[in-house]
Amino acid sequence: MMPEIEILEEKDFKIKFILKNASPALANSFRRAMKAEVPAMAVDYVDIYLNSSYFYDEVIAHRLAMLPIKTYLDRFNMQSECSCGGEGCPNCQISFRLNVEGPKVVYSGDFISDDPDVVFAIDNIPVLELFEGQQLMLEAVARLGTGREHAKFQPVSVCVYKIIPEIVVNENCNGCGDCIEACPRNVFEKDGDKVRVKNVMACSMCGECVEVCEMNAISVNETNNFLFTVEGTGALPVREVMKKALEILRSKAEEMNKIIEEIQ
């Protein structure tokens, strides 16, 4: 059977889905591709011309690097693939400028971008506070990169999965309820004089229910279905991250097939 994806829940920055008919290797490859292979924009270096705040230049640069930037993959090249040879041009990088005086809290929305569409994804993130008489003037240059290079380029902040198990309660069950009390995830409930599974998605496969069941009525088995939870940073829509990750995996698989054919 071919792997399938079933969307369970989708919000602005979060998505839950089931990856069906997949091996653990495929599930983990998909997770790693979303975190480490899909490109996103991030501040790469900062030129600070004036800083009389209480913060060191390095601290400000680090904070800017971790701010998610709205990313348009069709409008920018990776610097390693750009015609400028990686020196930096409008096709592979963009600048954000700031010139402010205190007293003021500097927010991510205060920065002026070369492109009005390419801005920090969330405009109310506080960067630092300037007090009376303090100034900050800088230029931050952003480019595309991947999480393999640095965490600041990851388009997702959370990308995890768990196996969806198969839980079987057989005819040996006497309805004692020990498994209900032992289960830390509230997976079981009483059903007359028996026990039934009410929330298999919550199961962490800890095995507590199997341990306490003296009747050997419960079995918990692995399946080929995985529950994914993915939260984006705002740099890219989560669906686009998923789609791009699948494209990358397909490209890698095709490249591997070519290598194998050449060897044969």
Curated annotation (Swiss-Prot):
Enzyme Commission identifier(s): 2.7.7.6
Cofactor note text: Binds 1 [3Fe-4S] cluster.
InterPro entries per UniProt: 4Fe4S_Fe-S-bd, 4Fe4S_Fe_S_CS, DNA-dir_RNA_pol_30-40kDasu_CS, DNA-dir_RNA_pol_insert, DNA-dir_RNA_pol_RpoA/D/Rpb3, RBP11-like, RNAP_Rpo3/Rpb3/RPAC1, RNApol_insert_sf
Cellular compartments annotated: Cytoplasm
SUPFAM superfamilies in alphabetical order: Insert subdomain of RNA polymerase alpha subunit, RBP11-like subunits of RNA polymerase
Amino-acid positions noted as binding [3Fe-4S] cluster in the UniProt annotation, renumbered to this chain: 203, 206, 209
Keywords, comma-separated and alphabetical: 3Fe-4S, Cytoplasm, DNA-directed RNA polymerase, Iron, Iron-sulfur, Metal-binding, Nucleotidyltransferase, Transcription, Transferase
Reactions catalysed, as given in the entry: RNA(n) + a ribonucleoside 5'-triphosphate = RNA(n+1) + diphosphate
GO biological process terms held by the UniProt record: DNA-templated transcription
One of the Pfam families matching this protein, by short name: RNA_pol_L
Main location: cytoplasm
Cross-referenced CDD domains: RNAP_D (cd07030)
Iron-sulfur as UniProt keyword: yes
Function: DNA-dependent RNA polymerase (RNAP) catalyzes the transcription of DNA into RNA using the four ribonucleoside triphosphates as substrates.
Listed name of the protein: DNA-directed RNA polymerase subunit Rpo3
Organism of origin: Archaeoglobus fulgidus (strain ATCC 49558 / DSM 4304 / JCM 9628 / NBRC 100126 / VC-16)
